[in-house]
């Protein structure tokens, strides 16, 4: 090998080493860059993961805090409610104790008054005994005076004088007792009734026997009548209601005395008008649907009335009968509204007297329950109501209340008396009831006839829409004290022979005129 070849070999080695070093350096730097980038990516990802984890932990902590706060607030609210309920119960107990205390005080006052009354009666009896002894003495003297008369003449004279004196004493006694009873009872009764009326509000009513259905146009009248009147005949036959189609624009009148059948006809007709298909088969289908809808409506009405009054445990069939009262009127007054009003009034009066409020409301709501079916079953609404409540196992107090609220039988409980009183208040309220002109005129004529049939009556006049009768008497036949007796007798006869809402005032007028002429 020559020197040149060695030099070339050395140069080649050096160059190869340099190239290898350069290549290796580049590769190493690239690997470092890759490693650096990878490390930075891992660090960045770790930071993001740490940040995400941190946010999740913060959110979890906030949620836990909110949940804990909600639980604490709920628990605090429950405790507040419990404390409030306890306070309400304590307050209610205090009110109950106050009410019982007032009741006891009233009863003590009543007992004191009764004791005073008994003492007065004893004094009166003693006075009457003294009067009787004096009368015997007078009669003995009278017998001695009339000894010269015949036996028959003496007997007639004594009987006449005794009769006149007894009539006078009877008139005085009636007047005294009437004044005493009014003075003691009216004050307490008015207070109770005023409190009850203040807590009761009701609408004025009017009786109706027709319903009006609006039509989209007058062409619908022809479709309702149908070919040769078959549609209207079918509807009238199925519902028992008369359809009156006249010149009234866009309206059909439904006439009938049964409000339930009239309402069924109205619902069915409105459905037919809305559907547009009016023919006998469709009419039958809609009437059947209306009946089912009406039954459900009656049931819901009864349940709502029972719920509003806070009553429980009433038989479902009885609740349905309560709902039927919404479609029954008495002197133009809706019987369901009247029954609810009576129930509320009876409840208020019962609370004032310390009686069972719930039982009073129950008796008040059911007192006219017989009117729900009195047009379907024979008998008065009182008899029917007693049968229904007995059948559905109502309380004996409720049954007696129904039987006695018109005075047919004796009231056996205070609640029965309260319901009868509430019934009178509801019926006598101005605007509560109306009556037909024929019944009104007949009642006025009967009222005047009762007064005119009494001896010594010159003329009588029914005024104030029949709520007062003024009786003018002959002064030479009726004395002032006899006028008191006459007013009492007329009042009793009116109570026995007439049916009327509220009360009737009897006024007897005795006028004496003395006329002379100066010459």
UniProtKB/Swiss-Prot annotation:
Residues 335-428 form the HD domain. PANTHER family: RIBONUCLEASE Y (PTHR12826:SF15). Pfam families: HD (PF01966), KH_1 (PF00013), RNase_Y_N (PF12072). Endoribonuclease that initiates mRNA decay. HAMAP family: RNase_Y. Its main location: membrane. It is found in: Cell membrane. This is Ribonuclease Y. It comes from Lactiplantibacillus plantarum (strain ATCC BAA-793 / NCIMB 8826 / WCFS1). Belongs to the RNase Y family. It is a single-pass membrane protein. Its EC number is 3.1.-.-. Residues 209-272 form the KH domain. GO terms for molecular function: RNA binding; RNA endonuclease activity. The chain crosses the membrane at residues 3-23. InterPro entries: HD/PDEase_dom (IPR003607), HD_domain (IPR006674), HDIG_dom (IPR006675), KH_dom (IPR004087), KH_dom_type_1 (IPR004088), KH_dom_type_1_sf (IPR036612), Ribonuclease_Y (IPR017705), RNase_Y_N (IPR022711). SMART domains: HDc (SM00471), KH (SM00322). It is an enzyme of class 3 (hydrolase).
């Amino acid at each position: 090998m020559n020197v040149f070849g060695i030099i070339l070999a050395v140069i080649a080695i050096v160059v190869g080493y340099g190239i290898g070093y350069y290549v290796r350096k580049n590769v190493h730097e690239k690997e470092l860059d890759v490693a650096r980038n990878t490390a930075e990516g891992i660090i960045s990802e770790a930071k993001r993961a740490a940040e995400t984890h941190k946010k999740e932990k913060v959110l979890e902590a906030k949620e836990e805090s909110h949940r804990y706060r909600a639980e604490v607030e709920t628990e605090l609210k429950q405790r507040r409610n419990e404390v409030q309920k306890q306070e309400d119960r304590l307050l209610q107990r205090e009110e109950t104790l106050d009410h019982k205390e007032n009741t006891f005080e009233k009863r003590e006052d009543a007992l004191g008054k009764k004791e005073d009354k008994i003492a007065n009666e004893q004094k009166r009896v003693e006075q009457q005994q003294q009067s009787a002894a004096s009368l015997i003495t007078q009669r003995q003297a009278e017998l001695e005076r009339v000894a010269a008369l015949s036996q028959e003449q003496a007997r007639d004279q004594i009987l006449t004088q005794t009769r006149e004196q007894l009539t006078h004493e009877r008139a005085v006694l009636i007047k005294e007792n009437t004044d005493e009873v009014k003075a003691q009872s009216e004050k307490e009764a008015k207070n109770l009734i005023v409190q009850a009326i203040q807590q009761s509000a009701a609408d004025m009513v009017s009786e109706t026997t027709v319903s009006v259905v609006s039509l989209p146009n007058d062409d619908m009248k022809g479709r309702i009548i149908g070919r040769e009147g078959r549609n209207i005949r079918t509807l009238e036959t199925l519902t028992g209601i008369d359809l009156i189609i006249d010149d009234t624009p866009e309206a059909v009148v439904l006439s009938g005395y049964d409000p339930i059948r009239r309402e069924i006809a109205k619902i069915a007709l409105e459905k037919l008008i809305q559907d547009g298909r009016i023919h006998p088969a469709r009419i039958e289908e809609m009437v059947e649907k209306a009946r089912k809808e009406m039954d459900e409506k009656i049931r819901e009405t009864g349940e709502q009335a029972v719920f509003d009054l806070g009553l429980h445990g009433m038989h479902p069939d009885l609740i349905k009968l309560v709902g039927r009262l919404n479609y029954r009127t008495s002197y133009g007054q809706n019987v369901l509204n009247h029954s609810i009003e009576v129930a509320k009034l009876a409840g208020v009066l019962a609370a004032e007297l310390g009686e069972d409020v719930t039982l009073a409301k129950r008796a008040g709501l059911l007192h006219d329950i017989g009117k729900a079916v009195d047009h379907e079953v024979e008998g008065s609404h009182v008899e029917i109501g007693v049968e229904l409540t007995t059948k559905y196992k109502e309380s004996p107090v409720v049954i007696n209340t129904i039987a006695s609220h018109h005075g047919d039988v004796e009231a056996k409980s205070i609640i029965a008396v309260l319901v009868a009183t509430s019934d009178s208040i509801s019926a006598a309220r101005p605007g509560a009831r109306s009556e037909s002109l024929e019944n009104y005129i007949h009642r006025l004529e009967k009222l005047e006839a009762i007064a005119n049939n009494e001896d010594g009556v010159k003329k009588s006049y029914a005024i104030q829409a029949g709520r007062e009768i003024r009786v003018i008497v002959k002064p030479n036949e009726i004395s002032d004290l006899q006028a008191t007796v006459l007013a009492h007798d007329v009042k009793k006869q009116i109570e026995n022979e007439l049916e009327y809402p509220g009360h009737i005032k009897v006024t007897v007028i005795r006028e004496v005129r003395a006329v002379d002429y100066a010459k």
